[in-house]
Amino acid sequence: LGKLVPHGLKNASRDPATLEAWWRSCPRGGVGILPGPEVLVLDFDDPEAWEGLRQEHPALEAAPRQRTPKGGRHVFLRLPEGVRLSASVRAIPGVDLRGMGRAYVVAAPTRLKDGRTYTWEAPLTPPEELPPVPQALLLKLLPPPPPPRPSWGAVGTASPKRLQALLQAYAAQV
């Protein structure tokens, strides 16, 4: 469908008539899904990463997921309200973060030129029916807290002589 959406997500549509026209025009086109901001898609490029995380978080097995042509997985989960993750987070080797209203996912029944396909292993559900991201997994994906800020004393707690000495010391370094 690249020729139908030359600007990618900017040309995306949810309009049934538009989608129907695209399918008539290009019946072998691929499918892309842009999940909303409340949907996290774990993109496992490495089948071993999927197996490891699935064993660590058995709840992932109940999530809607598809198998990719290279043997990876796309696992669809619901983020807690107000939680924002960065797609650039690389907290888990072999796993990319997609969806979240910012990154699309190629989806079944897309077929590659070599004949390999995307296939659903567990069917996709509406966002409100997706299982939540397991808490322990979410903690791995959240950015680290900012470093503590230095706590300065309240105004008026340093003597004028101390402030003058600090200013002179800083001025001498400049």
Label every PLM stretch briefly.
Residues 1-164:
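Conserved phosphate/metal-binding and DNA-contacting active-site motifs used
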Residues 169-172:
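A mid-sequence, solvent-exposed acidic-amphipathic segment
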